Swiss-Prot record:
Compositional bias (Low complexity): 406-419
Organism of derivation: Yersinia pseudotuberculosis serotype O:1b (strain IP 31758)
Primary localization: membrane
Feature: compositional bias, Polar residues: 37-52, 435-444
Record Pfam families: HlyD_D23
Chain positions covered by the region annotation Disordered: 37-60, 398-444
Protein name: Multidrug resistance protein MdtA
UniProtKB keywords: Cell inner membrane, Cell membrane, Membrane, Repeat, Signal, Transport
């Protein structure tokens, strides 16, 4: 009995201890959470009081960047993909047969018209020339003798010592000898020409390519294998295509240039369309449209003194066909695309925004021409557009590149103040930091 009562008392003690621990834990959680809740409620009440006292005065305005629409002279360009071609290309071959004795050029070098390129063995043609000269000397002697005989026959015919037939025969012999002499002279000229052809010279100025035949090979005239190819790259041409719908603008640009004795400018840009390589002028237009592609070919010429254009190089050709006067221009980022069409956000004197539908014209990556819907001098929003609504007041901020980059310390201070005054923006973004604009290209 005693042992059983001891066990019972121990059990009561153990259970009592567990209950006490549970009560202590629950009490701590209850009173601790209540304190936190009270503190949080007090803070929220304080914030509510601050907001009620301050009203809208503490609500920050949406930051935007703005630009002013200006009037400018804007050139109108037409752009097409083109290929650089040599102004002239010559395939150099031999006009005579013989062994190739020497090459007098270095592959890739610039040569001038008349420079010696190669030599064919001249000895066979020297022999032919000597033979022709010898035959000429022989026939010339025969002619001289025939002429002397004719002079004697003419004297004798006057005295009647020879017949008229003998006189006529001698006259024919003289003419025959004269013909032989002329033929011999032609043979000499031909031999000299063949001898000249054994020295192959550059027919045009330009850059020689890789040699197609080595010294020591026997060359036959008229063979399909050339010795070398010369391309004229000073100047050089670019052939490019444009849609047939652009033909009227091109023709009008040509007529305007002819009236002022000017040229139609053409620019050659690299394939990424980021760097201009050369400036030239429109040389010619093809006389027919390609029915397969609906395009027309144009050829432009460039001096290419710095050799930036190379044959068969792909370029973007831009031809200037017009110059717009007093065109209203805004940054490209200001123009947005909506369900009703293109529009811009304008700013009044109170920095309140308003949506204006516009008609756009010529544009590039930097600016766009507004044909209708906007006047020069009006301010338009270029950044922070995604948070705008009709009639809302905004804060126009200076672009970061013009402000913070010049004074990093001031920028950091302003950012810290902005973060402290507007904690609800989150992610550490300053209140006056310009919002990223959504361009028409990104929306599409």
């Amino acid at each position: 009995m005693k042992s059983q009562s001891k066990r019972t008392s121990r059990l009561f003690v153990f259970v009592g201890g567990v209950v006490a621990i549970i009560i202590a834990v629950l009490s701590w959680r209850y009173f601790g959470t209540g304190s936190d809740n009270n503190t949080s409620g007090a803070q929220q009440s304080a914030r509510g009081q601050d907001t009620s006292h301050g009203g809208r005065r503490n609500t920050p305005l949406a930051p935007v960047q703005a630009a002013t629409a200006t009037e400018q002279e804007v050139p109108r360009y037409l752009t097409g993909l083109g290929t650089v071609i040599a102004a002239n290309t010559v395939t150099v071959t031999s006009r005579v047969d013989g062994e190739l004795m020497a090459l007098h050029f270095t592959e890739g070098q610039q040569v001038k018209a008349g420079d010696l390129l190669a030599e064919i063995d001249p000895r066979p043609y020297e022999v032919q020339l000597t033979q022709a000269q010898g035959q000429l000397a022989k026939d010339q002697a025969t002619l001289d003798n025939a002429r002397r005989d004719l002079a004697r026959y003419q004297k004798l015919s006057k005295t009647g010592l020879i017949s008229q037939q003998e006189l006529d025969t001698q006259s024919s012999l003289v003419r025959q000898s004269e013909g032989s002499v002329k033929a011999d002279q032609g043979a000499i000229d031909s031999a000299k020409l063949q001898l000249t052809y054994s020295r192959i010279t550059a027919p045009i100025s330009g850059r020689v390519g890789l040699k197609q035949v080595d010294v020591g090979n026997y060359i036959t005239s008229g063979t399909a294998t050339p010795i070398v190819v010369i391309t004229q790259t000073h100047p050089v041409d670019v052939v490019f295509t444009l849609p047939e719908s652009d033909i009227p603008a091109i023709i009008q640009a040509q007529k305007n240039a002819e009236k002022t004795h000017a040229i139609v400018p053409v620019e050659a840009w690299d394939r990424t369309n980021k760097q201009m390589l050369a400036q030239g002028y429109l040389l010619s237009i093809d006389n027919q449209i390609d029915t397969t592609t609906g395009t027309i070919k144009l050829k432009a010429r460039f001096n290419n003194e710095d050799d930036v254009l190379f044959p068969n190089q792909f370029v973007n050709a831009r031809i200037k066909v017009d110059l717009l006067q007093n065109a209203v221009v805004v940054p490209t980022a200001a123009v947005q695309m909506g369900s009703e069409g293109n529009f811009v956000w304008t700013l009044d004197d109170a920095n309140k925004v308003s949506k204006h539908l516009v008609t756009t014209g010529i544009q590039n990556s930097q600016q766009v021409v507004i044909d209708a819907g906007l006047n020069a001098g009006q301010r338009v929003v270029t950044d922070g557009i995604d948070r705008l609504t009709e009639g809302v007041q905004v804060e126009v901020v200076t672009p970061r590149s013009a402000n913070t980059d010049a004074n990093p310390a001031s920028a950091e201070k302003a950012a810290a103040e902005a973060e402290g005054s507007t904690p609800h923006q989150g992610r550490g973004r300053p209140a006056n930091a310009p919002a990223r604009s959504t361009t028409a290209a990104e929306k599409s």
